[in-house]
Swiss-Prot record:
HAMAP family: Endoribonucl_SymE. One of its GO terms (molecular function) is RNA binding. It is found in: Cytoplasm. Keywords: Cytoplasm, DNA-binding, Endonuclease, Hydrolase, Nuclease, RNA-binding. Its main location: cytoplasm. It comes from Escherichia coli (strain 55989 / EAEC). This is Endoribonuclease SymE. The gene is symE. GO terms for cellular component: cytoplasm. GO terms for biological process: RNA metabolic process. InterPro entries: SpoVT-AbrB_dom, Toxin_SymE-like, TypeI_TA_SymE. Involved in the degradation and recycling of damaged RNA. It is itself a target for degradation by the ATP-dependent protease Lon. Its EC number is 3.1.-.-. PROSITE patterns: SPOVT_ABRB. It is an enzyme of class 3 (hydrolase).
Amino acid sequence: MTDTHSIAQPFEAEVSPANNRQLTVSYASRYPDYSRIPAITLKGQWLEAAGFATGTVVDVKVMEGCIVLTAQPPAAAESELMQSLRQVCKLSARKQRQVQEFIGVIAGKQKVA
């Protein structure tokens, strides 16, 4: 008699067969000795549809017989204020003091002499 824990449960595949891709590992030539190194090239509109638009940072995990590519979320854009602060940091000490005084005047903490 079959044990209840050994009965296969029906399940849906995580990846539909229409989304499967097959490719062959090719090679790239390395200068100066022109030795062949393994290379995998991925290209196609399906990459963008899968979340891998041009410029996307990709995390690569490598295991025996398995490579997992994960698209990283875009970094939060730096605020305009932080960009300005970075520019002020590059100024001379005298100009930095002028900026601080200006901020003080705008904030109402100081009065113009």
